[in-house]
Amino acid sequence: MSQDFWFLLLPGFSVMGFVSAVEPLRVANRFHADLYRWHVLSADGGPVLASNGMSVNSDGALEPLKKGDLLFVVAGFEPLRAVTPALVQWLRKLDRNGVTLGGIDTGSVVLAEAGLLDGRRATLHWEAIDAFQESYPQLSVTQELFEIDGPRITSAGGTASIDLMLDLIAQAHGPQLAVQVSEQFVLGRIRPRQDHQRLQVATRYGVSNRKLVQVIGEMERHTEPPLTTLELAERIQVTRRQLERLFRVHLDDTPSNFYLGLRLDKARQLLRQTDLSVLQVSLACGFESPSYFSRSYRARFAASPSQDRAVLPLKAPAATPPGAPAGHRTPRAERG
């Protein structure tokens, strides 16, 4: 008996994340006919415009699904632009009816907004994780490629959707079929869920010095509150002068200026992806002085935090999450 996979495409969705989820199902059917069926939905039943400008036709709107089906919300930039009370109510009804719910790329944001990730592990695209954590601090978010936690299945999007589907194929029909499918995509290996979403520090920054890689990792993990240069040096067991020399020789920078850049980059993401105030963003990135934050931000991005902030459209509030008091409004988080 075929298993039905449904993909709800939201405007601005990632084509890579979507296609990487569908293609493994298609290839699995080449080896064993009719294992899977897949369908595309949109909020209004019409075509959906992806982030790259492509238009994808849908098979229907928010229709009833049956127990045992899988529904993935596929999103990308600004997923909450598409969230409406009708969508939230539909997702909750699917959950009550035994449909497994998932998110691809930033689809997890929509599930969180609907109150459907409470008590479950979830992941999403690395670029949106900081904003997600700030907007939904009560939820358990990881940096894994994908998460399967009971009736919730989430993927970071991109090629991680392939790894997720290979895992689901292996669970349902055995690892050998998953290997056969992976070989059709010329994959060197099937990545486990705990693989890193991002390239290693050494690759991202073009450095090979072990101590330098370690200290950049410490900086990325401690943006609030930030560590002092002396504390950073102590953590990698070098002197302050040795640490400063490492940055000068390999990055033509100082530790403090490099660290400041990391924190400002995080601040920019939060400004563009959340409803946090400028003050809240500055505090979340380790800036105790709002004026220093604004000056530093303008120096790096040639715009003030308020000028650089993405404009979030007003929309009707989503339905109240289960068990929440009247008037509750879940914080927003958007990738982009």
From Swiss-Prot:
Q: What happens when the gene is disrupted?
A: Cells are incapable of growth on carnitine.
Top-rank taxon, per record:
Bacteria
Report the Gene3D superfamilies cross-referenced here: 3.40.50.880, Homeodomain-like
- The residues that make up the annotated DNA-binding region are 230-251, 278-301
Molecular function terms from GO: DNA-binding transcription factor activity; sequence-specific DNA binding
Q: Residues in domain HTH araC/xylS-type? A: 213-311
Task: State the UniProt keywords alphabetically.
Answer: Activator, DNA-binding, Transcription, Transcription regulation
* Region called Disordered, residue ranges: 305-336
What's an example Gene Ontology biological process for this entry? positive regulation of catabolic process
Q: Can you list the disulfide-bonded cysteine pairs?
A: none
The signal peptide, as residue positions, is none
Is Transcription regulation among this UniProt entry's keywords? yes
Isomerase listed as a keyword: no
| Its biological purpose | Induces the transcription of the PA5384-PA5388 operon in response to carnitine. This operon is involved in the degradation of L-carnitine, and allows P.aeruginosa to grow on L-carnitine as the sole source of carbon and nitrogen.
Q: PANTHER family from the entry?
A: ARAC-FAMILY TRANSCRIPTIONAL REGULATOR, HTH-TYPE TRANSCRIPTIONAL REGULATOR RV1931C
User: What is the protein name stated in its UniProt record?
Assistant: HTH-type transcriptional regulator CdhR
Question: What is the originating organism of this protein?
Answer: Pseudomonas aeruginosa (strain ATCC 15692 / DSM 22644 / CIP 104116 / JCM 14847 / LMG 12228 / 1C / PRS 101 / PAO1)
